[in-house]
Swiss-Prot record:
Entry-linked NCBIfam families: L-threonylcarbamoyladenylate synthase
Subcellular compartments: Cytoplasm
Top-level EC class: transferase
Organism this protein belongs to: Mycobacterium leprae (strain TN)
Name of the featured protein: Putative threonylcarbamoyl-AMP synthase
Chief location: cytoplasm
Amino acid sequence: MVRMNEVFDCADPDQRARGIASAVAALKGGRLVVMPTDTVYGIGADAFDRAAVAALLSAKGRGRDMPVGVLVGSWHTIEGLVYTMPDGARELIRAFWPGALSLVVVHAPSLNWDLGDAHGTVMLRMPLHSVAIELLCEVGPMAVSSANVSGQPAAVDVDGARGQLGELVGVYLDAGPSAQQAASTIVDLTEATPRILRAGPVSVARIAEVLGVVPASLIA
């Protein structure tokens, strides 16, 4: 039985194991979890639980017009989530995953999820954080957004997340301060030409080099 608002110190092996198990139970029960990632802390739900994703948006005070992204625990997971692998996707995944790069792609039409008004697209990322990967490998793809109330700073530690989200979250996994302390770079691969929608830790120059394009062509 998962008690509400549990916090687990993942620096302690026993607490980490119990925390992962509690987070898995919470997610399977339709509850929300705060988890560490390499960029900022995230608030997450089972990506295929529509009610839980709606609760996530509500906890953040966010509308359907700002859909939730999805974190995955392995490279191959993306194959089952996309309609087709767009040009450049494999190159970017090989270069930057796991890491601070999110890719917007057209999702497979058969997927039974509702992440908000995403118009057939989904933002995917594989985080560079062992706790996040362990959880994702246990539960599968998770709908995850930054662990903050909309309009407030993204939390870079568990105390910042708890201060904003409190009892709305069932389990908090504490792994200390985020390494990057900045939201991921976002690249849109849904059109013929890749575009950077948000600057972040992965630079325009590095992305352009991998794609073999001029950096200026990536600026939205």
